[in-house]
């Protein structure tokens, strides 16, 4: 374990530990966590979900080699006023959403909190509309309340 410049003596534990702590700053995850970079730059401010108001419906062209228009919505977050694009999952899901509806968005589940699959630049997905889950609306278990 000890490298060429590492102390190898019987009482070298403190020195080895301090050296390890210093080199942790070269690790990307450690640096992001310690400097709280996610909370600073993430529109959701580190939270798993956020509430927002739908501004418009948009169609996003998928990346190569696929060819499709994926349905999404532009959402203005209540907590900080930032505008993000959120994917609407499911077949015909965008029909349940109108402008000025209140939606809850969550991360889409891409690597390192980034976009997923063939959706360029979309990091979030819609999970609730006006307090009713999108899943319940699909299955016909509940109807969307009129605001």
Swiss-Prot record:
PROSITE patterns named in the record: RIBOSOMAL_S12 (PS00055)
The keyword rRNA-binding is assigned to this record: yes
Assembly with partners or alone: Part of the 30S ribosomal subunit.
Family as reported in the entry's similarity comment: Belongs to the universal ribosomal protein uS12 family.
Database matches in SUPFAM superfamilies: Nucleic acid-binding proteins
Name assigned to this protein: Small ribosomal subunit protein uS12
GO BP annotations, alphabetical order: translation
Annotated InterPro entries: NA-bd_OB-fold, Ribosomal_uS12, Ribosomal_uS12_arc, Ribosomal_uS12_euk/arc
Highest taxon, organism lineage: Archaea
GO cellular component: small ribosomal subunit
GO molecular-function terms, A-Z: rRNA binding; structural constituent of ribosome
Pfam families: Ribosom_S12_S23 (PF00164)
